[in-house]
């Protein structure tokens, strides 16, 4: 097993840069040590991406709360487990793995997560991918934020520099941090989705400006630009994966939130308009415009139980001029719609039972969605729908947990069932595979220290 030298060099450079930064607050290896609070203060299940009200405020204010001291603002994370699909895949999902029943280390990540000054904070991640077997640049969000008062209103204003549209978002109803928060790279997944749902992750760099006014109205706008082939090679993502974004890709976000006793509500909209060159050497382009609605509900009584519900509906308009001209699509325009709804019951911030429903649908295209083993469509359709059930346990992360704040662990069992996959239930790919053959089981462990 070998690791690309440029990616290793990038990881080392990232560490050295932050260690050399003049830390007014003395950076720490984790946000828990920085704030002095347990992980349960920010996370609904004491560990993982799902945020509490305090967690959203911490992120909004640039990761700058707290004055804890430690010389190294570093943390490590590991994700892995056992994955199995109902029917073995036609070929191994990645080199060095079998077509089914795989035990794997999926991710090993190094985090730089700390405040850098009273108004600047960072969340930066470099990850070793267990299926691809190399290091690469991962989610990064560097923020400047400060409180302001004007015209009788209190506000927080800030700027985020990040490399994944929605990674900077405060809610778990947008793609970057959505349920089920973890998945296996070694089982089948739907072959398509909106551009905003991770297609550009780490392939772009953007800046957005945001504000939250009077704790209710959130507004954000900015733009993303594509990164060069050379940059992607240097950070372990490879030029062949470049999306070749042309010009700037505008991003917007608006939301309204309110709290009534033990009930929290938010609803909003977000979107992205991106033009891409499928062939980086040719000028022809495809344009994707994503517009979405989303909502969150949290019930957090004084007792041990809590309920979290998230929902989103993304509509994507596709202008496929480049693909149509190249014969890669049989019509120049198309669309996608992606609906996701999830609900979780959480007990003592240690146990969780969640159910998520997903439905992706779009216009038929017999070339764009052609028959192929496993990933293809006999009907020329992207339509995929199903459900994901997830049971989890977090033994640490509370105020009285042992080894706090140095270690946290999340273990779980995830089961995904498909009613339809790429346009069909039986023989959906034209090679005899059924949608239920892609049903999968994932037993996982998620460790941070």
Which residues does each PLM region occupy?
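Outer membrane beta-barrel
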Residues: 50-52, 74-84, 98-229, 246-262, ...
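The canonical Cys-X-X-Cys-His
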Residues: 37-46
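Outer-membrane beta-barrel "beta-signal"
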Residues: 38, 389-395, 435-449
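Sequence/structural signature of outer-membrane beta-barrel proteins
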Residues: 81-87, 127-131, 149, 164-168, ...
């Amino acid at each position: 097993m070998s690791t690309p030298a440029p990616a290793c060099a990038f990881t080392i450079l990232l560490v050295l840069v932050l260690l050399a930064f003049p830390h007014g607050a003395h950076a720490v290896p984790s946000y828990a040590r920085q704030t002095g609070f347990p992980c349960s203060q920010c996370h609904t299940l004491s560990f993982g991406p799902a945020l509490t009200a305090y967690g959203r405020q911490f992120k909004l204010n640039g990761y700058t709360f707290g004055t804890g001291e430690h010389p190294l603002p570093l943390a490590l994370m590991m994700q892995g487990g056992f994955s199995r699909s109902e029917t073995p895949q036609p070929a191994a999902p990645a080199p060095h793995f079998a077509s089914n029943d795989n035990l794997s280390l999926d991710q090993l990540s190094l985090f730089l997560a700390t405040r850098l000054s009273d108004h600047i904070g960072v969340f930066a991640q470099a990850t070793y991918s267990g299926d691809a077997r190399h290091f690469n640049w991962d989610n990064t969000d560097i923020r400047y934020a400060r409180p302001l008062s004007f015209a009788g209103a209190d506000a927080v204003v800030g700027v985020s520099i990040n490399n994944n549209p929605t990674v900077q978002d405060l809610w778990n109803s947008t793609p970057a941090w959505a349920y089920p928060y973890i998945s296996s790279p070694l089982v089948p997944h739907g072959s398509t989705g909106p551009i905003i749902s991770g297609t550009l992750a780490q392939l772009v760099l953007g800046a957005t400006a945001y504000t939250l006014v009077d704790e209710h109205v959130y507004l954000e706008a900015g733009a993303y630009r594509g990164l060069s082939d050379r940059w992607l090679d240097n950070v372990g993502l490879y030029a062949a994966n470049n999306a070749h974004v042309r010009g700037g890709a505008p991003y917007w976000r608006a939301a309204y939130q309110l709290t009534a006793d033990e009930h929290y509500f938010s609803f909003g909209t977000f979107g992205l308009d991106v033009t891409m060159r499928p062939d980086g050497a040719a000028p022809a382009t495809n344009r994707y415009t994503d517009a979405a609605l989303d909502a969150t509900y949290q019930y957090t009584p004084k007792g041990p139980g809590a309920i979290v519900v998230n929902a989103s509906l993304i509509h994507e308009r596709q202008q496929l001029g480049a693909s149509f001209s190249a014969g890669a699509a049989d019509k120049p325009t198309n669309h996608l719609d992606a609906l996701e709804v999830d609900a979780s019951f959480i007990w003592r911030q240690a146990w969780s039972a969640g159910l998520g429903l997903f439905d992706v649908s779009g216009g038929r295209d017999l070339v764009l969605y052609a028959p192929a083993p496993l990933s293809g469509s006999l009907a020329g359709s992207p339509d995929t729908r199903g459900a994901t059930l997830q049971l989890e346990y977090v033994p640490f992360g509370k105020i009285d947990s042992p080894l706090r704040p140095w270690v946290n662990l999340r273990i779980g069992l995830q089961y995904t069932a498909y009613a339809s996959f790429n346009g069909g239930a039986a023989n959906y790919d034209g090679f005899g595979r059924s949608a239920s053959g892609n049903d999968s089981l994932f037993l996982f462990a998620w460790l941070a220290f």
